[in-house]
Amino acid sequence: MDVVEGKALQVSDAVYAYQLDGKGGMTAISVDAVASATQPCWLHLDYTYPESAEWLQNTPLLPEVVRDGLAGESMRPKITRLGDGTMITLRGINFNNDARPDQLVTIRVYMTDKLIVSTRHRKVYSIDNVLNDLQSGTGPTGSGHWLVDIADGLTDHTSEFIEDLHDKIIDLEDDLMEQKVPPRGQMALLRKQLIVLRRYMAPQRDVFSRLASERLPWMNDDDRRRMQEISERLGRGLEDLDGSIARTAVLSDEISSLMADAMNRRTYTMSLLAMVFLPTTFLTGLFGVNLGGIPGNTDAFGFTIFCMMLVVLVLSVAWWLKRSKWL
């Protein structure tokens, strides 16, 4: 890449615009700044902001094929090499307010040894973590180091979220052991979170693995080693996701079985009640026909005797059901 000057990186509504000092710190990008491999410039933009969107479409620092990708069209994690630059799309857990974690945030990055251009719409907290390290002087020293720190933060957040989902599954399993059915929709949401996370983290693991294996000029051996460790850590998380998805399938079957058993018990109880009261209903209906007068209507104790007959009949049927082991 040709010389990258600070005056070409002046974007008024940029989220962040810093130059790494090569020692773990940073300075604001000035008009007179000149980016180098040891002191790359980092421009972090929200592609929905007007000035940022205009800069992305018009700057000569970006290849034509990168512009749309940085402007929000790229969603699935992937890596594309373009000459001396690399286009990378990554996904992360959404920790923004009023949003579910499974509604993943996206960070898109175009990198060279001298320039880092990253874009997002929703806030990516891993970016803020790297920024805090830079402010304290313990941040990345170059482009490769910066990318590794971003990948490390994204993977840490993913691992934490997987652990949270794992704890929820354990709670559901404990509830089912106590015959407690979870609220409607809870299992469906849990399965969706697992499946969505699996869908995007699998290609992201492949991106990390490729970054670790390719000889990118702005990544040194230490960066590649750390990236390989991150890829392996995410791979273990994917194995946990696969196991969790299988466990939720078993839980769904168990919940269906539990609800079916409850319905069968209710149906069985209603059937027994019908059997108990069917003879009494028959007798009361028969006496209610009233053809030629109701039997016993002239007897002062007729109604009492009839009620006692019904009680004896109900008890007899109940005794028979008990003896037949139906009750």
UniProtKB/Swiss-Prot annotation:
Q: Which residues lie on this side of the membrane: Periplasmic?
A: 293-300
Transmembrane stretches, start-end? 272-292, 301-321
Query: Which ranges does the record list as Cytoplasmic topological domains?
Result: 1-271, 322-327
Instruction: Kindly list the GO molecular function terms attached to this UniProt entry.
Output: cobalt ion binding; cobalt ion transmembrane transporter activity; magnesium ion binding; magnesium ion transmembrane transporter activity; zinc ion transmembrane transporter activity
Q: Does the record bear Protein biosynthesis in its keywords?
A: no
- Entry's PANTHER family? CORA FAMILY METAL ION TRANSPORTER (EUROFUNG), ZINC TRANSPORT PROTEIN ZNTB
The entry's family comment says:
Belongs to the CorA metal ion transporter (MIT) (TC 1.A.35) family.
Q: What is this protein called?
A: Zinc transport protein ZntB
In the UniProt record, the gene name given for this protein reads zntB
